[in-house]
Amino acid sequence: MAELSPMMQQYLEIKKQHKDEILFYRIGDFYEMFFDDALTASRELDLTLTGKQCGLEERAPMCGVPFHSYEGYVARLIAKGYKVAICEQVEDPAKAKGLVKRDIIRVVTPGTVIESSMLQDDKNNYIASIFLKGGAAGLCFADVSTGTAHITELKREKIAPAVIAELCRYHPSEVLMNPSLLDCREITAYLKKNMNCAVELVEEERYAPGLVSIALENQFGRDWPAKTGMAEDGLVRFAMAALLEYLHDTQIKGVERLKTVITYNEAQFMSLSPVTRANLELTETLRGREKRGTLLWVLDKTSTAMGKRMLRSWIEQPLVSSAAINRRLSAVESLVNQTMQRGDLIEQLHYIADLERLMTRAVYGSATPKEIYTMAQTCERLPDLRAQAESCSCPELTALAGQIDLLDDVKTAILAAIDPDAPSTLKDGGVIAKGYHSEVDELRSIRDNTKGVLAQLETRLRQETGIPKLKIGYNHVFGYFIEVSNSYKQMVPETYIRKQTLTSGERYITQELKELENKILGAHERLIALEHRLFAELLEKIGGQLDRIQRTANAVAELDVLAALAQVAAENNYCRPVVDDSDELTITEGRHPVVEQMLKGSLFVPNDTKLNCTTDRCLIITGPNMAGKSTYMRQNALIALMAQIGSFVPASSCHVGVVDAIFTRIGASDDLAAGQSTFMVEMTEVAEILKNATPKSLVVLDEIGRGTSTFDGMSIARAVVEHISDPAKGLGCKTLFATHYHELTDLEGSIEGVKNYNIAVKKRGEDITFLRRIIRGPADDSYGIEVAKLAGLPGTVTRRAHEVLRALEASAPKNKVEQMDFDALQEYSSPAVPSEMMEKLEALDVETLTPIEALNFLYELKKTLSGSLKG
């Protein structure tokens, strides 16, 4: 039987180590794929499938892509959930003895992409590492493209919702997890259904304490706890170590770039559940999942890629420290009030490249000459940028300016080394600047002027020897030689070495000519190799300034965000909110920031809001569909959130007492795939709100109780309002509650702090006009038929509906719902739970309970409860 060819043996040996990846195998100017990889790649990338003789009786399936444009193909495979192993030729084919050596230089995965062509400029690309143990978790979110990691630890009786909340905060494209996470179906189901990310299970052996310590020491040194903020006995060290080992396995080099570790506490930021993030459309719309129509779209006037990513981060993570918020607001206010300086600052920011990602590509050795020269051009702009920030006469901006390192040494090194017209690749040379390295200049001179160099040497040798007819020639056998006719042989110096005798004379070589020959014949190859080496040395030199460049990049990004927020505030007539630790949410003439921009050219009707935890705890809002209730409630939530990221807000005045969380239940969305109806989804979301909200939270609820019978729905809505708004029964937090149950308006007066509001409607005959104005008091009608008419129902249908309505109103003495005596409900209360049962429940260790033990325990509880009720 035929054997595999040597090259195919090499391929299969490498493939054996990377069974789960598509192997890009470099052959000349192409990356080739074979066997199953070729079948997959040809299908996913629409490549022509061919075959290659590999020594077997059949041809191996094969397809390929040009090496100079491979990134686009890799990006498409990554987007489809594949990993790609890049196998390069690691020796010069011209010098190889036999088969060219090849090796894996990196494995590209969704969370480890660093190529600018494969990344979104305005979005971080996080890889998450989660270590779960019981009711605690260590989490690490790293952006390999910027070299920054965020770490935290969570402890909860129910850990899954907390972990999911952090996943939603960072939106990782890849998640590493320990085997214990497989038992947490809530997290794994959420990852599968909602996160659209790759998941990698890390073997339990990788978490051995000894291996963890080695990984952390190798990356951060022996004093890693002090450098990173990780506790020596904390769970996050396991998550970080697993991430570092994964990066070492996939990236081969450059992992040292991951040096900036930011320890955070979830309590530093406003809590935003996944549902709230979606309902408020912070960074993507619910329907099209696009940027236009989101809060990010409105606020993004940033000039740099770094600023765009930071703005997104601020929106995803509003602050809860009033002092930190007001520092941001003061900087924004200073820029709002200084129009000229703001304009000059923004102009300077437009010239700043993406220092964060350029730095990473330099460390990983994948930066192009043009990118590095762009870094130098950015450094040239830093003095003007810093001076502009300092001129704003604002302590916060001056402090940021002080963090901008001018990076003179980096700029000087790059400008000295890189040619201003350097190409995008090293392939053809032309990268190193003239005068930077004498050998480069000499090799270029030889390559570009071989005839001239030989003529100069020939003239000099004639002068030195006195032989007027001395000539320099060349043939393929002897290479370059010096030819002297017989009549001048006696004048040839002793240092000349005779190589060939002719009838007419002699041919010689000299050491100088031999060296020149080597230079001429190998000038281009040696020039390319030398430029590669010098460029690599420059990248290493730049990489040594990692901390300085990272610090500068962060300062520039923050300046950019502050300038953008100021520009938006000035253009859209926003005001500075008063932010403190009170319980107030008072807004005068508030507007919805997004709807206002979408309605450019139309008048947006502003509305006032007054909420607190005493006299105005819960606003019950009634009125017809399409009148603007949801818009009004969302705008209040968005204004509070905008204030807490440090932004001015769309209002004439605003007072925001810091809220620790925003919870929303807006709209209906059946989860049929998971077997959940609209009502089930609604109740699940409301349950989460009731469990997690605090008196410092802002709750927005829209149409609670739909999807079930009228009595059931109304009863649930009533109970929810009581629990949320009445401190004696539950939370007493600030709440906006929209409802079609007009009976709930009776709660004003019976529960302190509950107030009725409605959307003003103007009616003429059977036609209505929505005035979009929020006014005190309950709505006088639901206007359901009128809304149906506006929605386009045929006139015959709406007229018939009016007839039926009049008949029902005439025949029915009183709707049963209207006869409900809610006050009578106060007399009823739930039966007391026996203290014995409570003691058993409190002593129960849910984490260690087996299914059989759980059933037995439930049986005993039922017996106890039955006996108690009978007694």
Listing of model-derived features with the role each one plays in the protein:
Residues 1-334, 350, 354-363, 367-459, ...:
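Charged catalytic and DNA/RNA-contacting regions of genome-maintenance
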Residues 87, 110-119, 254, 390-396, ...:
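Active-site phosphate-binding and catalytic loops of NTP-dependent enzymes
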Residues 364, 368, 378-381, 399-402, ...:
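Charged, surface-exposed helical/loop "interaction arms" that form contiguous linear patches used
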Residues 502, 506-540:
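Extended, charged coiled-coil "arm/hinge" scaffolds of SMC/Rad50-like chromosome-maintenance ATPases
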